[in-house]
């Protein structure tokens, strides 16, 4: 106790498992800091996210078209080859071609198609995620099941916190991602309100939770990312011991954050593609297993990684800076509240 305030030793988001600092936990500040960080990141990097979403949905749509043409060809139409060729010419192949297509057909504003639900989704996503993550970390490192302060490796608490935050956040935020995918890939909606009403009318409340099952698999993304991040930081700290006593530079943190995101992105990207496909209005698949079979049958293993380039280009920079953005807002809000 210090002046009536309770302080506990809690691992900082960017500290290795050996390092702890005294932190006064404030759920409101954590929620607001995560919200502001999510909005800032979304505004800066949404164009790449839009390109990525269009490529992911295009992958499943192309797979369906190819399957239907194959059926027609087997039925004796004889036009399968030429039609298949026309499909490949009509659809942009790759992130650069997709970006050019968006700019040519929709102008610069096309890169921000569907941005409204994404801003709201990011605000809720990171606000909820970081507040739950920090709250779980606070609880985990305050006591164990016997009421004693936890003294084990910090990565265990990080893992439990990441899984807990990921599951709860996914369940809450999924409707925003459904709206984002619909607005980013379809021109039939005049805005977020129209899309919301249309989905509710034609698909019911359940339509907003399309793809939520596969989204839960994505909880592993945060787990892979954070464990990798902690490990890389620890290795760099050990290598810096002889030079500067183990102090880590800003570059060290950015490298660790970017590399950890790269590892997590490569391992979990297929689920992102399947989730986007299931949430798309034109998706012909009724389940995750059906989507996996359809994509694999048409494009093989590489089909599960279509669009991974813009995904990594979009996600690595904000991942490398996100923790610092959160720390900045957290420190600013803490100082302002005192």
Swiss-Prot record:
Main location: mitochondrion
Protein name (Swiss-Prot/TrEMBL): Mitochondrial substrate carrier family protein I
UniProt superkingdom: Eukaryota
Record flagged with keyword Membrane: yes
GO biological process: transmembrane transport
Keyword annotations of the record: Membrane, Mitochondrion, Mitochondrion inner membrane, Repeat, Transmembrane, Transmembrane helix, Transport
Single GO term (MF): folic acid transmembrane transporter activity
Mitochondrial matrix side: 46-109, 180-203, 275-307
Membrane disposition: Multi-pass membrane protein
Mitochondrial intermembrane-side positions: 1-24, 131-158, 225-253, 329-338
Annotated InterPro entries: Mitochondrial_sb/sol_carrier, Mt_carrier_dom_sf, SLC25A32-like
Alphabetical list of PROSITE patterns matching this protein: SOLCAR
Function: Mitochondrial solute carriers shuttle metabolites, nucleotides, and cofactors through the mitochondrial inner membrane. Transports folate across the inner membranes of mitochondria.
PANTHER family assigned to the protein according to its UniProt record, in alphabetical order: MITOCHONDRIAL NICOTINAMIDE ADENINE DINUCLEOTIDE TRANSPORTER 1-RELATED-RELATED
Compartment annotation: Mitochondrion inner membrane
Family of the protein in this entry: Belongs to the mitochondrial carrier (TC 2.A.29) family.
Solcar repeats: 25-139, 153-235, 248-332
Segments traversing the membrane: 25-45, 110-130, 159-179, 204-224, 254-274, 308-328
Gene Ontology CC annotations of this record: mitochondrial inner membrane; mitochondrion
């Amino acid at each position: 106790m210090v002046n009536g305030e309770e302080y506990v030793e809690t691992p900082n988001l960017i500290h290795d498992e050996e390092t702890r600092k005294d932190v006064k936990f404030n759920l409101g500040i954590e929620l607001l800091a995560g919200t502001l960080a999510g909005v800032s990141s979304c505004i800066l990097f949404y164009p790449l996210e839009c390109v990525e979403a269009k490529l992911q949905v295009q992958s499943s749509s192309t797979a369906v078209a190819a399957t239907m043409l194959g059926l027609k060809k087997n039925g004796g139409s004889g036009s399968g080859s030429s039609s298949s060729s026309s499909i490949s010419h009509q659809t942009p192949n790759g992130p650069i071609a997709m970006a050019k297509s968006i700019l040519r057909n929709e102008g610069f504003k096309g890169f921000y198609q569907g941005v409204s639900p994404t801003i709201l989704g990011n605000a809720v996503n990171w606000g909820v995620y970081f507040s739950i993550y920090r709250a779980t970390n606070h609880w985990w490192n305050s006591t164990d099941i016997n009421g004693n302060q936890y003294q084990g490796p910090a990565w265990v608490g990080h893992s439990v916190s990441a899984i807990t935050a990921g599951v709860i956040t996914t369940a809450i935020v999924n409707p925003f991602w459904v709206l984002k995918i619909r607005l980013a890939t379809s021109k039939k909606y005049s805005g977020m309100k129209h899309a919301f009403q249309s989905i509710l009318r034609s698909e019911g409340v359940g339509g907003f939770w399309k793809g939520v099952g596969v989204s839960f698999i994505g909880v592993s993304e945060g787990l892979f990312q954070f464990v990798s991040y902690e490990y890389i930081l620890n290795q760099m700290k050990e290598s810096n011991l002889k030079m500067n006593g183990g102090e880590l530079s800003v570059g060290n943190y950015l490298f660790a954050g970017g590399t950890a995101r790269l590892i997590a992105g490569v391992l979990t990207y297929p689920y992102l593609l399947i989730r986007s496909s299931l949430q798309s209005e034109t998706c012909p698949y009724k389940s995750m297993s059906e989507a996996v079979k359809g994509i694999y049958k048409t494009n093989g293993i590489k089909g599960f990684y279509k669009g991974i380039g813009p995904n990594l280009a979009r996600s690595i920079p904000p991942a490398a800076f996100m923790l610092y953005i959160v720390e900045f807002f957290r420190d600013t809000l803490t100082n302002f509240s005192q």
